[in-house]
Amino acid sequence: MRFKIKKCPKCGEYTLKETCPLCGEKTKLAHPPKFSPEDPYGEYRRRLKKETLGIGVKK
C-alpha cells in the first residue's frame, strides 16, 4: 500500500493523516497533479487565473 504525504494548509505541517495532528485542519495532498501533454483542463485553469488576477478583463 502506497502512502501519499499530506500537508496542512493552515499551519504547513506534513503528515500521513487526513487531519492535522497540531491544529485539526483537513489536510491536502502535497503532490502536484500528474502531467499530461494533452492537458484537458488547461483552458479552464488559464481562464480562472486570468479572471482571478484581472488580466484582460474590461472594467
Swiss-Prot record:
Listed GO CC annotations: ribonucleoprotein complex
A GO term for molecular function: snoRNA binding
GO biological process: pseudouridine synthesis; rRNA processing
Pfam families for the chain: Nop10p (PF04135)
InterPro entries (alphabetical): H/ACA_rnp_Nop10, H/ACA_rnp_Nop10_sf, Nop10_arc-typ
Transmembrane regions listed in the UniProt entry: none
Keywords for the protein's UniProt record, in alphabetical order: Ribonucleoprotein, Ribosome biogenesis, rRNA processing
Family classification: Belongs to the NOP10 family.
Biological role stated in the UniProt entry: Involved in ribosome biogenesis; more specifically in 18S rRNA pseudouridylation and in cleavage of pre-rRNA.
Protein name per the record: Ribosome biogenesis protein Nop10
Source organism per UniProt: Thermococcus sibiricus (strain DSM 12597 / MM 739)
Gene of this entry: nop10
